[in-house]
Amino acid sequence: MNNSYISPFAKPVYVMLKPVGSVCNLACEYCYYLEKGKLYPEVKNHIMSEQLLEKFIEDYLECQTMPQVLFTWHGGETLMRPISFYKKALELQKKYGRGRQIDNCIQTNGTLLTDEWCRFFKENNFLVGV
């Protein structure tokens, strides 16, 4: 894709990534998402594989027509994936980003936040929603 010309009519594409599906460490009464796992009873593991992560990032960046791209990580509880998963995501964003500005936001219930997570988010400019 040639990004040297961006149409004034170009529209960004937005999606939320759910790297753990509906898996969560809480069972909040108001949560609309806990029941979603029951929609696919044959699927025992709703965790995003690294192969799917790479394919998604490559395809998502390929379809973007804007110079700035946003990745929104949502759950279930996103921090149930290890930091290494998100480090891999950042590597893949750089690999397939073709120099574009890439931003990341992540939604968490906050119960699994540690100093290590906070350093990672700060060092990589994640917008964190709790």
Where are these regions (language model features)?
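Conserved, mostly hydrophobic/aromatic
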Residues: 24, 28, 73, 106
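Short acidic, glycine/Ser/Thr-rich loop/turn "cap" segments at secondary-structure junctions
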Residues: 39-41, 71-76
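Radical SAM/AdoMet-radical enzyme domain recognition
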Residues: 57-58, 62-72, 81-130
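Short glycine-centered, acidic/aromatic-flanked micro-motifs in structured strand/loop junctions
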Residues: 19, 75-76, 108
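Alpha-helix capping and helix-loop boundary segments enriched in small/acidic/polar residues
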Residues: 43-47, 77-80, 105
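Cysteine-centered catalytic environments shared across enzyme families
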Residues: 1-10
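Well-ordered alpha-helical segments embedded in enzymatic catalytic cores
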Residues: 52-56
